[in-house]
Amino acid sequence: MSRSAKKGPFIHKGLLRKIEEMNEKDEKKVIKVWSRASTIFPQMIGHTIAVHDGRKHVPVYVTEDMVGHKLGEFALTRTYRGHDDDEKTSKRK
């Protein structure tokens, strides 16, 4: 279920404040964020945001294609190592 249109997109207030301050000063620093639910706004394009994945901060460089998506979509929380090739099960069949 998507968010109600009358509420508008969610973004952490501190993150938005930091982005606006950096845009005024023309700075491009890495911003550490724990708010994976924040929506990516057009003001964030060109910035690198370090999104927390539960263990560490994963650097995410924001491009135009990412606008409207959530920050958490680009920092995976689970490591997929693939399925094991178990030779015993394949020989039985």
Swiss-Prot record:
Entry-linked Pfam families: Ribosomal_S19
Annotated GO MF terms: rRNA binding; structural constituent of ribosome
A GO cellular component annotation in the UniProt record: small ribosomal subunit
Matches recorded under InterPro entries: Ribosomal_uS19, Ribosomal_uS19_bac-type, Ribosomal_uS19_CS, Ribosomal_uS19_SF
PROSITE patterns on file: RIBOSOMAL_S19 (PS00323)
Top-level taxon in the UniProt lineage: Bacteria
Matching SUPFAM superfamilies: Ribosomal protein S19
GO BP terms, alphabetized: ribosomal small subunit assembly; translation
Keyword set, alphabetical order: Ribonucleoprotein, Ribosomal protein, RNA-binding, rRNA-binding
Function: Protein S19 forms a complex with S13 that binds strongly to the 16S ribosomal RNA.
UniProt family annotation: Belongs to the universal ribosomal protein uS19 family.
NCBIfam families: rpsS_bact
HAMAP family with a match to the protein in the record: Ribosomal_uS19 (MF_00531)
Name of the molecule in the record: Small ribosomal subunit protein uS19
Organism: Alkaliphilus metalliredigens (strain QYMF)
